[in-house]
């Protein structure tokens, strides 16, 4: 190896090395490197290129540089914007950096150039080395088809081992460390051996890469680039013995250990976790398996909350938060008493039936609070798909558990209070009958093994306290109705509405509208006037809206009053000020700074019976009597709807014809049959009321119920229609202040009806003084509060003779 010493400017390179014979350009932006380039251009255009050991070092010293670099000749230098120089260099020979002579204004090194010592090889030995290197290169080019063909031709054309080593050192991609090892090699043989090792390693890497790509191509379509990248990553992790879901699986196993469940359930979940582990990590099957495992782990299999068994506390909570609802409260307290005596018993399945706004949903929340149960509300209104209850089978895309299982997940315990809201509003379609799906849920004998289609493992619902709500039982299928304990939540009386408004609604709306009790006062008479003149409902929702409207208007009135007082205060302060040119804001600031004592206390607005119209306008309802005088053929009936009771005027006219019975007013089939019964019964009384047989052949009977756009049905108008028809035929008048309800038989017996409380309230609101009800409804009458019948005479009748006796003038 021939060596000689000299000094040259030094350029420190980052993350790159220049080999002898290499033509390359690079950018220089460090000041010392730019100075070195410019100094070299002034001398012989030669510079020593040395790689930095750490690329992050900004001002390298001798210890920060590799000991071996390359002497290069600068072919071209271009100045770029931003104080950057681009240089084109050619590597000439290797050199050893002995020391740095100076570091400012640029690095200058004392170096020793060295040329690789030529080997004393025979022609055959050199040919063997060339062929071996060429064979390795051919294998490399086979694996790497991106190599430039000109480079391949240059290497293959080389006949000397020295030339071939130089060409391969330049063109084969290798790490900075490998390039430094080649530069530091003591002779050509060492360079040759290192190059062979580098080529062999590159070939192995390329082969593994090709195998990975082939595995990926067998699984996915070639055009899905993003998907291919994910699969490549997955295959690499598989080759390394790693999987992407290891952490998730470990987490699932930890959750399984802590899960409170039976051994059978745990074993099933463990199998599902193992199945998830065996599924590929990025396909749809994996997502389904993951969702299923997470659902199973989140269910409260045997986790329960401790119920409060304090009867006094439960009673206090129920009485404090709700007025009335006596039957509901008694049933809850009965359940608590039984639970205390037996320690364990079936949870009740209750259905609260009543008009809207009567507190069915809110009482359920209070019951949960009284019993210390988790509260879950499931809205069933409009649900028509069976899968909403039982869940979807996991074979379907986007499958989910049903609402019952979802409710348990939300509660996180197996003994919550679950409110099934609007159970009478469920419907069915071609996908299944939701009411039938609810049969298993609400059957205390079966729901201990409820099977959701998604979960597929029996879930115990026997400890869930189900409370359903409905406006009517008529739309609930009989088998489902039979499984529930029906508790009627009847309409509120005016007195009950008053207490609810005074003790609950008023305080709630004052707080909701940002007011204070010291700012508003609504008298008792004003509340009663709102109830009687501005609402007509079974519940209290409309009443709450009216109270809210009053509070909103008072809030605005208070703010306007305060603003007006502030304006007067500022105006007064400005008049007292000597500076008449002060702006409005300056005066306001001065008033605030000096705390002028003209501030007024917020006034209290009182709402009374006299000024209630200021806030709510004219009354919307009046207690009017249906008929002001006794008339022929007009009778006041009583009806019961899903939103409460109402009066029903039935009008009958007799006119010449052919004996037809004309029915108008959108009557249902049951009501039409009641009309037929009534006319048949009246014909049986022909002799008693001196009606000729020819009358029914020569006259038509027309029965009409006003508000013809509203459908009407039910049997309880039987005695009303019969009385109206007899009045029209005989010309006898009916008492205007008498209302009646009851079903009639062909023999004239009066059968019982439902919704007695609602009907009596409707009669009272209309100003009726006497009400005729079936004798068999006497027990229902005795259960009613005295205030409902106060001011009315309620007469129980067993036959039509008694009805006619009290109704006809």
Curated annotation (Swiss-Prot):
Induction of expression: By heat shock.
The keyword Protease belongs to this UniProt entry's keyword annotation: yes
Domain Lon proteolytic residues, every copy: 629-809
GO biological-process terms attached to the record: cellular response to heat; protein quality control for misfolded or incompletely synthesized proteins
SMART domains, sorted: AAA (SM00382), LON (SM00464)
GO MF annotation: an example: ATP binding
Gene Ontology CC: cytoplasm
Location of the Lon N-terminal domain: 8-203
Catalytic activities: Hydrolysis of proteins in presence of ATP
Keyword Cytoplasm: yes
UniProt-annotated location(s): Cytoplasm
Annotated TM spans: none
Keywords from the UniProt entry: ATP-binding, Cytoplasm, Hydrolase, Nucleotide-binding, Protease, Serine protease, Stress response
Active site per the UniProt annotation: 716, 759
Domain of life: Bacteria
Positions that bind ATP: 354-361
E.C. designation(s): 3.4.21.53
NCBIfam families per the UniProt record, alphabetical: lon (TIGR00763)
Quaternary state and interactors: Homohexamer. Organized in a ring with a central cavity.
Recorded family membership: Belongs to the peptidase S16 family.
Function: ATP-dependent serine protease that mediates the selective degradation of mutant and abnormal proteins as well as certain short-lived regulatory proteins. Required for cellular homeostasis and for survival from DNA damage and developmental changes induced by stress. Degrades polypeptides processively to yield small peptide fragments that are 5 to 10 amino acids long. Binds to DNA in a double-stranded, site-specific manner.
Entry protein name: Lon protease
């Amino acid at each position: 190896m021939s060596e000689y010493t000299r000094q040259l400017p030094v350029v420190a390179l980052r993350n790159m090395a220049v080999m002898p014979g290499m033509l390359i350009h690079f950018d220089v932006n460090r000041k010392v490197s730019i100075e070195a380039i410019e100094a070299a251009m002034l001398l012989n255009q030669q510079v020593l290129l040395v790689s930095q050991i750490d690329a992050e070092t900004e001002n390298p010293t001798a210890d920060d540089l590799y000991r071996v670099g390359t002497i290069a000749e600068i072919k071209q230098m271009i100045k770029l914007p931003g104080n950057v120089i681009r240089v084109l260099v050619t590597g000439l020979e290797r050199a050893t950096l002995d020391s740095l002579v100076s570091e400012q204004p640029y690095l200058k090194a004392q170096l020793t150039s060295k040329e690789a010592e030529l080997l004393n090889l025979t022609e055959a030995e050199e040919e063997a080395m060339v062929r071996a290197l060429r064979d390795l290169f051919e294998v490399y080019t086979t694996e790497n088809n991106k190599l430039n063909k000109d480079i391949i031709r240059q290497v293959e054309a080389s006949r000397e081992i020295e030339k071939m080593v130089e060409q391969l050192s330049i063109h084969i991609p290798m790490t900075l460390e490998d390039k430094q090892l080649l530069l530091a090699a003591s002779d050509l043989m060492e360079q040759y051996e290192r190059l062979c090792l580098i080529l062999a390693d590159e070939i192995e890497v390329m082969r593994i890469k090709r195998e990975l790509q082939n595995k990926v191509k067998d699984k996915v379509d070639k055009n899905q680039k993003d998907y291919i990248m994910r699969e490549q990553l997955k295959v690499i992790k598989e080759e390394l013995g790693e999987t992407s879901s290891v952490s998730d699986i470990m987490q699932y196993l930890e959750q399984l250990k802590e899960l409170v469940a039976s051994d059978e359930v745990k074993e099933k979940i463990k199998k599902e976790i193992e199945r998830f582990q065996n599924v590929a990590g990025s396909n749809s099957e994996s997502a389904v398996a993951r969702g299923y495992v997470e659902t199973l782990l989140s269910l409260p299999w045997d986790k329960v909350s401790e119920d409060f068994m304090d009867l006094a506390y439960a009673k206090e909570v129920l009485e404090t938060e709700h007025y009335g609802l006596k039957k509901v409260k008694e049933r809850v307290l009965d359940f608590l008493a039984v639970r205390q005596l037996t320690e364990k018993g079936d949870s009740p399945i209750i259905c609260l039936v009543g008009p809207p706004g009567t507190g069915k949903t809110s009482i359920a929340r209070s019951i949960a609070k009284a019993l210390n149960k988790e509260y879950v509300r499931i809205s069933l209104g409009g649900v028509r798909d069976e899968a909403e209850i039982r869940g979807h089978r996991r074979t379907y895309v986007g499958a989910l558990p049903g609402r019952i299982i979802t409710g348990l997940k939300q509660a996180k315990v197996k003994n919550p209070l679950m409110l099934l809201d609007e159970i009478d509003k469920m419907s069915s379609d071609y996908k299944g009958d939701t009411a039938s799906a609810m049969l298993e849920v609400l059957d205390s004998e079966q729901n201990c093994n409820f099977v959701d289609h998604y979960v597929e493992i029996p879930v115990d619902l026997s400890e869930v306290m189900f409370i359903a709500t409905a406006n009517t039982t008529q739309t609930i299928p009989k088998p489902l109705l039979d499984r529930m304990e029906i508790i009627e939540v009847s309409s509120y009386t005016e007195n009950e509405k008053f207490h609810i408004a005074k003790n609950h609604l008023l305080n709630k709306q004052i707080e909701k509208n940002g007011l204070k009790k010291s700012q508003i006062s609504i008298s008792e008479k004003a509340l009663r006037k709102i109830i009687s003149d501005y609402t007509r409902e079974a519940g209290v929702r409309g009443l709450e809206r009216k109270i809210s409207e009053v509070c909103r208007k008072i809030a605005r009135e208070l703010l306007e009053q305060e603003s007006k007082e502030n304006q007067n205060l500022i105006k007064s302060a400005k008049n007292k000020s000597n500076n008449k040119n002060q702006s409005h804001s300056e005066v306001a600031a001065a008033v605030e700074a000096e705390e002028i004592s003209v501030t007024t206390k917020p006034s209290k607005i009182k709402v009374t019976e006299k000024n209630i119209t200021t806030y709510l306008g004219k009354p919307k309802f009046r207690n009017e009597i249906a008929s002001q005088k006794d008339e022929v053929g007009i009778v006041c009936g009583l009806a019961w709807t899903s939103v409460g009771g109402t009066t029903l005027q039935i009008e009958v006219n007799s006119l010449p014809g052919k004996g037809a019975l004309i029915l108008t007013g959108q009557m249902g089939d049951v009501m039409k049959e009641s009309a037929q019964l009534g006319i048949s019964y009246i014909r049986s009384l022909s002799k008693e009321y001196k009606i000729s047989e020819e009358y029914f052949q020569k006259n038509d009977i027309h029965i009409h119920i006003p508000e013809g756009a509203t459908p009407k049905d039910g049997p309880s108008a039987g005695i009303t229609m019969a009385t109206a028809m007899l009045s029209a035929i005989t010309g006898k008048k009916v008492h205007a202040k008498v209302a009646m309800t009851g079903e009639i038989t062909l023999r004239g017996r009066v059968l019982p009806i439902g919704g007695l409380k609602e009907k009596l309230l409707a009669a009272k609101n209309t100003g009726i003084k006497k009400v005729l009800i079936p004798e068999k409804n006497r027990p229902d009458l005795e259960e009613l509060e005295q205030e409902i019948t106060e001011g009315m005479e309620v007469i129980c009748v067993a036959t039509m003779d008694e009805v006619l006796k009290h109704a006809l003038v």
